From Swiss-Prot:
Annotated residues for binding of ATP: 196-204, 217
Membrane spanning stretches: 138-158
EC number: 2.7.11.30
Gene Ontology MF terms in the entry: activin binding; activin receptor activity; activin receptor activity, type II; ATP binding; growth factor binding; kinase activator activity; metal ion binding; protein serine/threonine kinase activity
Catalytic activity line of the entry: L-threonyl-[receptor-protein] + ATP = O-phospho-L-threonyl-[receptor-protein] + ADP + H(+); L-seryl-[receptor-protein] + ATP = O-phospho-L-seryl-[receptor-protein] + ADP + H(+)
Lineage: Eukaryota, Metazoa, Chordata, Craniata, Vertebrata
Cysteine pairings via disulfide bonds: 29-59, 49-77, 84-103, 90-102, 104-109
Gene3D superfamilies xrefs: CD59, Phosphorylase Kinase, domain 1, Transferase(Phosphotransferase) domain 1
Range of residues in the leader sequence: 1-18
Name recorded for this polypeptide: Activin receptor type-2B
Quaternary state and interactors: Forms an activin receptor complex with activin type II receptors such as ACVR1B. Interacts with VPS39. Interacts with DYNLT1. Interacts with BMP3. Interacts with BMP2. Interacts with BMP6.
Length: 512
């Protein structure tokens, strides 16, 4: 019975040690959240700091200074950060940031915060007006010692009861559910600004994280499976690629029945390829750049990489909802693949997970998907993606001004044939039975580059899945076509189509 009391004495000593050493230990911080209504949290109060063992804890504050008016953004606990070590006062030193940020060590050290630029200049100090202690604060400080003693007694009792493990002990593993907020993101000031899109599983917000804009995809709790699936795909080794959307964090926000699941990624101001083509006509070089980077992203997604940059094995992944709405554009029109909620990984020796056949967006479904006649093998799913890529390439060509002819208003694939909201039966009739595809205009074929690209498009959406090109082959072809056309004089444009199509184009099966 001596062991519990020794542990009790050690625990009590550790609780009392902080005041004796005179070090700035951080156990509690002032809490504030200007965005509390949207994030469904408390607006202000106290926050108890919790972190990993052997990690230091700090307090922080963030605010804006608009023409001398202080606008508080957030206050709270901050995890181990060497920039905060041994700082007893909360002082921001950046010259003129959009959001000021400071951190410090010591209980409630973020109550008062200051801006003091490193280069010198006037010191701007914000000190909240003195307020009388609330009843809640008085109760908290009164009950804290009693709660601490109760905890020690309970711990001693628990150690006594568990000094020997009982026979027949069985570990029970429960679904842990969504993770807590990512420590480094959950505590940084993140403000939702405006809704940019609404989709099948929720909405996408433009948000501000410190001085950067990010995208926040918010799922309701009933769509937890989609959020979890996309988070797992993003967490796969090797998913950092210039043509795949950059993942930042996955978080659980709110509590009880108001829980929301957040997926935080890089933000791209130009939006989706669909939105861009609706408002813009593109040049030949822009078409080639989007097509090449888009096919490069899909090729990398499809690729099985045994050892990817020291991260481990990157399996082959099928997107299963490839469409122009899920292709985002960077400022230089580099394509970035997004929305991996329906994606499937193909790992050696493991089942691929949920491979239900008819998923994705109806308009972009391959003939075999519309028929329900899918071979549930890796290559079959990759070829389904390639059919959809053919349709997206057609969308690009339809808005390109390179050909000598009119550029029509933007239309989705098959919109001209069966309208904006086709039924499954209408698509089966048009795509499967009549084997129709979106119209390739005659004047497109008079431009040598577009003519070759149309050949590539037709080989992507071939009715025979095994005859379709791979994404890697499309990337090679677009690169070759661009170099050929841009390096050719007008005198030999006529002969270029035949010579390149018959001789120089890479073979169909380059990676599938």
């Amino acid at each position: 019975m001596t062991a519990p009391w020794v542990a009790l004495a050690l625990l009590w000593g550790s609780l009392c040690a902080g005041s004796g050493r005179g070090e700035a230990e951080t156990r509690e911080c002032i809490y504030y959240n200007a965005n509390w209504e949207l994030e469904r949290t408390n607006q202000s109060g106290l926050e108890r700091c919790e972190g990993e063992q052997d990690k230091r804890l700090h307090c922080y504050a963030s605010w804006r200074n608009s023409s001398g008016t202080i606008e508080l953004v957030k206050k709270g606990c901050w995890l181990d950060d060497f920039n905060c070590y041994d700082r007893q006062e909360c002082v921001a030193t950046e010259e003129n940031p959009q959001v000021y940020f400071c951190c410090c060590e010591g209980n409630f050290c973020n109550e008062r915060f200051t801006h003091l630029p490193e280069a010198g200049g006037p010191e701007v100090t914000y000190e909240p007006p003195p307020t009388a202690p609330t009843l809640l604060t008085v109760l908290a400080y009164s009950l804290l010692p009693i709660g601490g003693l109760s905890l020690i007694v309970l711990l001693a009792f628990w150690m006594y009861r568990h000094r020997k493990p009982p026979y027949g002990h069985v570990d029970i593993h429960e679904d842990p559910g969504p993770p807590p907020p990512s420590p480094l993101v959950g505590l940084k000031p993140l403000q939702l600004l405006e809704i940019k899109a609404r989709g099948r599983f929720g909405c996408v917000w433009k948000a501000q994280l410190m001085n950067d804009f990010v995208a926040v995809k918010i799922f309701p709790l009933q769509d937890k499976q989609s959020w979890q699936s996309e988070r797992e795909i993003f967490s796969t080794p090797g998913m950092k690629h210039e043509n795949l959307l950059q993942f930042i964090a996955a978080e659980k926000r709110g509590s009880n029945l108001e829980v929301e699941l957040w997926l935080i990624t890089a933000f791209h101001d130009k939006g989706s390829l669909t939105d861009y083509l609706k408002g813009n006509i593109i040049t030949w070089n822009e078409l080639c750049h989007v097509a090449e980077t888009m096919s490069r992203g899909l090729s990398y997604l499809h690729e099985d990489v045994p050892w990817c940059r020291g991260e481990g094995h990157k399996p082959s992944i099928a997107h299963r909802d490839f469409k122009s709405k899920n292709v985002l554009l960077k400022s230089d029109l580099t394509a970035v693949l997004a929305d991996f909620g329906l994606a499937v990984r193909f790992e050696p020796g493991k089942p691929p997970g949920d491979t239900h056949g008819q998923v994705g967006t109806r308009r972009y479904m391959a003939p075999e998907v519309l028929e329900g006649a899918i071979n549930f093998q890796r290559d079959a799913f990759l070829r389904i993606d390639m059919y959809a890529m053919g349709l997206v390439l057609w969308e690009l060509v339809s808005r390109c001004k390179a050909a000598d002819g009119p550029v029509d208003e933007y239309m989705l694939p098959f919109e001209e044939e069966i309208g904006q909201h086709p039924s499954l039966e209408e698509l089966q009739e048009v795509v499967v039975h009549k084997k129709m595809r979106p119209t390739i205009k005659d004047h497109w074929l008079k431009h040598p580059g577009l003519a070759q690209l149309c050949v590539t498009i037709e080989e992507c959406w071939d009715h025979d899945a095994e005859a379709r090109l791979s994404a890697g082959c499309v990337e090679e072809r677009v690169s070759l076509i661009r170099r050929s056309v841009n390096g050719t004089t007008s005198d030999c444009l006529v002969s270029l189509v035949t010579s390149v199509t018959n001789v120089d184009l890479p073979p169909k099966e380059s990676s599938i």
